[in-house]
């Protein structure tokens, strides 16, 4: 069998990796080993932070919703309103409720009154 020289293939692979790391600083964009390590680290960080973003936004929605609900009624909390929301079988998630609370406080007031009136 003939010998296969992989110079062009290896160069193409490294060029592709370098293109991804061209935005990095210092040796992280110049040295192949470091580029590979930093690339893996970047992918791990991006995946981790995508999941973290979901948690952060849920926390933000809950905080905003709690503040809006407490402003509406005395002694009425976020947890009680979400519990009553599920009992009355209304299909509104936290994101939608928060958008309603920010844009139209009266609408949120009407929704919470309906939930309390149903008294399931």
Curated annotation (Swiss-Prot):
GO cellular component annotations, sorted alphabetically?
Answer: plastid; ribonucleoprotein complex; ribosome
Question: Can you say where in the cell this protein is located?
Answer: Plastid
Name the domain of life this protein comes from: Eukaryota
Principal cellular location given in the protein's record? plastid
GO biological process annotations for this chain's record? translation
Q: Which CDD domains match?
A: Ribosomal_L20 (cd07026)
- Please report a single Pfam family linked to this protein: Ribosomal_L20
Query: Key word Phosphoprotein present in the record?
Result: no
What is the purpose of this protein?
Binds directly to 23S ribosomal RNA and is necessary for the in vitro assembly process of the 50S ribosomal subunit. It is not involved in the protein synthesizing functions of that subunit.
Q: Which family does it belong to?
A: Belongs to the bacterial ribosomal protein bL20 family.
Protein name in the entry: Large ribosomal subunit protein bL20c
Q: Which organism is it from?
A: Cuscuta gronovii
Gene encoding it?
Answer: rpl20
């Amino acid at each position: 069998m003939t010998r296969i020289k992989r110079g062009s293939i290896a160069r193409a692979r490294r060029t592709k990796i370098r293109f991804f790391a061209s935005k990095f600083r210092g040796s992280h964009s110049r040295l192949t080993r470091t580029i590979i390590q930093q690339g893996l680290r970047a992918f791990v960080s991006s995946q981790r932070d995508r999941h973290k973003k979901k948690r952060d936004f849920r926390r933000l929605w809950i905080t905003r919703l709690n503040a809006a609900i407490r402003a509406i009624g005395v002694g009425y909390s976020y947890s009680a309103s979400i519990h009553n929301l599920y009992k009355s079988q209304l299909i509104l998630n936290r994101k939608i409720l928060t958008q309603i609370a920010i844009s139209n406080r009266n609408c949120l007031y009407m929704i919470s009154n309906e939930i309390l009136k149903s008294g399931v």
